[in-house]
Amino acid sequence: MNQQQQQLIQNEFDQLRWYYKNDFEKWAYISFNENQGSLAFFGGTGGNYHLNTTVIVKQIRINGNHLKILKEIFFLSCLKKNRYFVEILDVFLSNDGQKIYIVLKDEGPNLKDYINFYIKNDKLVSFDFFRHIIFQIACGLKILHDKNLIHSDIKHGNIVVSGTGLIKICDLGNTDKISKLKYAGTNGYLSPQVLLGKEMSKEDDMWSLGVVYLELFKKKAGIFSCPLDKKEKIKDCGFKVLKYLLENFYDIKKPNSNWYEENIITNVIINSIKSGEFNMFEYRLKPNLLEVEGLNDDDKEIIKKLLDLNPDKRMNINDLINSSMFQEYNYMFINSDINYREADYERYFGNENTIENNFNQFLNEIKQKINGLTLFNNNN
């Protein structure tokens, strides 16, 4: 992207119609008009921008978040050519150095909007298509998990779907090495362990995938979302959210007793989950939760294993991909590469205290990697 295009984005971004906004960032579809004198809905690939193509621009206020921002850009650069992840095209700082702009290839609507479109227009969606989506998400997660990385925010809004049914995982703002994250994600997609403040793991990604799996067939997002007041932050309400989850979606009982309709979720049960002492009680997903059109017995068993309260029993990514349910899709699996090296990670994030001082230098190096240079792996 040339300087004129970058300047146009900075000048006009705040006047655009954003499709997503929070206190930290804004997202917009942008396009240059034919003479590149203003912005509308804009686009391009590989840094060469053309009319009638679209890209997404993510504006982030830095405001001390140097580490989080740099990690997101770093992992996007590592996955730039990966089949299962959204492609980053460019990144640049605002003139005052207070904001950063991440330019991403527009891969299509997110999964939530995609399903809503079909429901609104009374269009039929193949149940096999849902399974194909889950399989592709699993393939993307395998790329991360094989490198001991976790996405940590898998949900409908972070999966985009192309017109041909290919998916791309997006929003790597919480992606990191295992043991580097303690709390990340979205209400309704957080595992019990995350809600209780434990370090994040691959099993937490699998939980989130289980939620997406169930919600796809129910054609409704946010099924497990706990109602919170506007002033309540999810990270401060872990006990409340977990209690809501257990009371509404699980049957809980003492060992060797009968299942009963009304759960009595006590501190003892939640503390047992926190300590991993699952022999103190028995549990199951409420059977009626899985009574969904198109969900066969194999689907139900996989969802049960993905949403197992015990992370040690939760289905892992390899078992999911190799399960009998997804055998017919295995030929579609593309072992798409990730240009990630532990040495690169340690260079940038090994000493987090240096990030702010070296931010511009590190950003420039990663930008060169995005633009196709081999700075990271150049040993000369």
Feature roles, as predicted:
Residues L181-V194:
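Conserved activation segment of eukaryotic-like protein kinases, specifically the C-terminal portion
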Residues D205:
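Conserved catalytic-loop aspartate of Hanks-type protein kinases
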